[in-house]
Amino acid sequence: MAIDRRRFLQLCAGAGALGLTPGRAAAYTPSPKLPIIDVHLHAYPADEALPTTPNPINGKSSVPKDGEGHLRACLAEMKRLNVVKGVVSGGSGDRLAAAAHWREAAPDRIIAGAGVRGSEDTPLPELGVLRNELAAGRLRVLGEVTAQYAGLSLSDPKYEPYLALAEELDVPVALHTGTGPPGISFDPCCRHFRASLGNPALVEEALNRHPKLRLNIMHGGWPYLEETISMLFHYPQVYTDLGAIDWLLPRAEFHAYLAALMRPGFGKRIMLGTDQMFWPDAIGIAVEGADSARFLTSSEKRDIFHGNAARFFRLGTG
């Protein structure tokens, strides 16, 4: 959910704004401690001052003072939870540089992605620069692509050369889908945002133009359940992550949505993502959200926590 984070905080920092249930305050450690790949993390420029708004779920003032402190706190939380790999994209400022800084700080743990949008205030990166970074392996994912916040879908011609590049280099794409903060389209940052543009079905033309493209539908496509199921059913190269919905939604709603994705047999295509934004402790809340789903077998949890992402990102295991 890579948007104007400060505006996100203004819009829905209070738990009531999203119908959330505060109070999940205890530090969480999964038991047994399964290896985890978090496919949805965000980085901020090292010298960027971060807001002090409490975590909207547990009420804790857990935001580090700047991007560098945020990096260190997130890496510590990843180590504590046995998050062996994390896919990170920039959330503000120079997004490519922010992700690269994380990779340089923990090259064995971090996979850097190219956070891109395509709006007037956040233009797409120069294609040649992106090609060089992807070809060299310094960036390994095209995403998070926040087309919805630019008033576009992934099938818009603006993204065509970038998708062609990803297909050519066999680089996976991670697309923001689903929802955004309440009232976001009224804010100057995101006047072109439309809820309807979060519909995962809008990727269909792009997928047919690029049949070899691997695509992660981020945020589980919530609340577009039927459309997400349709894309997973018709396009075997499509996976989905649970970022943000596994800690910001009420637990009962998240579990119901996850169960609905599991019932048609997509347990091998769902990946753990957190979308921690400013709050390092959100990583643990998100992991707990998936781990506490009692309808999941231990094998299904291993797939969601690690195996599916290892396969999607071609990490050599899973």
Q: What are these language model-derived features?
A:
Residues A2-L20, A26-V39, E48-A49, N55-K85, ...:
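Mid-to-C-terminal alpha-helical segments outside catalytic/metal-binding sites
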Residues L9, L75, V87, A100, ...:
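Non-transmembrane alpha-helical segments in soluble domains
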Residues P22-G23, Y28-S153, P157-E160, L165, ...:
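Mid-domain alpha/beta scaffold segments of enzyme catalytic cores
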Residues T29, R103, D108-I110, R140-V141, ...:
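Catalytic pocket-lining loop regions of alpha/beta-barrel enzymes
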Residues V39-H42, S89-G91, G115-R117, E144-A147, ...:
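Active-site-proximal beta-strand/loop segments in catalytic clefts of secreted hydrolases
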Residues Y44-A46, G93-L96, S119, Q148-A150, ...:
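Active-site environment of divalent metal-dependent phosphoester hydrolases
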Residues L71, P123, Y159, S196-P200, ...:
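A structural signal for well-ordered alpha-helical scaffolds and beta->alpha junctions
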Residues L124-N132, H255-Y257, G316-G318:
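Short, surface-exposed amphipathic charged segments that create phosphate/polyanion-binding patches used
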